[in-house]
Regions:
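Short, intrinsically disordered, charge-biased short linear motifs at domain edges
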Residues: 11, 227-235, 245-254
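Short, surface-exposed charged micro-motifs
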Residues: 65-67, 123, 252, 267-269
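S-adenosyl-L-methionine-dependent methyltransferase catalytic module, highlighting the catalytic core
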Residues: 60, 89-238
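Residues immediately within or flanking Cys/His clusters that coordinate Zn2+
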Residues: 241, 260
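Short metal-binding segments enriched for Cys and/or His
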Residues: 268-283
């Protein structure tokens, strides 16, 4: 995202200071206005080109199985994640369950033909307010077009044009209440024809970090000063906001020395590793 848009896009989206904003798949470039970050693969670098930014509360969770009560979030941001998701129906339904409204951004389907990525398994378009997802047969279905495009991007000024024409190259959907979508899938994915696709999660003890570019570092530093001016949620007690994946009960941290949080209703435990609360079904214990 261009640096100027980073600082003003929350105004364009109509996000108010007291709105609670959740971002799914924030990775190395979270939106300035996001109050809570969710990332599932903090211990796997294949989906990230830069280092993971943790400059505000981050929960390790699955976007298709979110640990938040229904309609508990005012705004949900999800940028450049949907095109990777094996079960988009479950994922989109979960976003609209948790959030009152939100924003979804993906590469535009036509652009993804020109500049495909190994982990993109869907072409995505916004057709009159409905997301249209079309299954890809392989990560690079049009190699001749891709090669031609890669020669084009070497032209002087191309990436400046790209930044200035963001809606032309990306699918953007602002939704309110529910997310409308249509999924065109003829058969099961053959993931051997793709690269960098997550089909399951392997528990880990830590965080895998890549180097963080200067631009992301500048954004993170400036966010510390700007966010208190535009958000009323700069001191969030995460266990009070999230809920148990099994029963929806409240989670509590018994003491600061604990390495887990416990559900007050069903007593399910979720671990805390490397300082991050991990709310994943495959890591919970009883």
């Amino acid at each position: 995202m261009p640096l100027l848009n980073y600082f003003v896009c929350h105004r364009t989206l109509g996000i108010k200071r007291h709105d609670l904003v959740l971002e799914i798949g924030s990775g190395g470039d979270p939106f300035l206005r996001s109050d809570i970050l969710v990332d599932q693969f903090v211990d796997d670098e294949v989906e990230r080109h830069t280092g993971l930014i943790i400059d505000r509360p981050l929960v390790v969770a699955d976007g298709a199985d979110l640990p938040f009560p229904s309609k508990s979030v005012d705004y949900v941001i999800c940028a450049h994640v949907l095109e990777h998701v094996p079960n988009p129906a479950k994922f989109l339904d979960e976003l609209s369950r948790v959030g009152k409204r939100g924003l979804i951004i993906t590469p535009k389907g036509d652009y993804d033909k020109l500049h495909p990525k190994g982990g993109h398994i869907w072409y995505v378009w916004n057709v009159d307010g409905t997301l249209l997802l079309k299954q890809k047969e392989s990560w690079n279905e049009y190699p001749d077009i891709r090669e031609y495009f890669h020669q084009m991007v070497r032209l002087p000024g191309f990436w400046k044009l790209f930044d200035q024409s963001y809606p032309f190259f990306n699918t953007i959907l602002e939704w309110d209440g529910t997310i409308r979508y249509q999924i065109h899938q003829d058969k099961q994915f053959d993931f051997s024809k793709f690269r960098k696709v997550h089909t399951h999660h392997e528990p880990s003890e830590g965080i895998v970090q890549k180097p963080t570019p200067s631009k992301q570092k500048i954004k993170a530093r400036m966010a510390r000063f700007v966010r208190p001016l535009i958000s009323a949620h700069t001191n969030i007690d995460v266990p009070r906001i999230v809920c148990c994946l099994l029963c929806g009960g409240k989670l509590s941290l018994m003491s600061h020395a604990d390495t887990y949080v416990t559900c007050s209703r069903c007593e399910t435990r979720f671990p805390i590793r490397a300082g991050l609360l991990r709310l994943l079904r495959e890591e919970m214990t009883h």
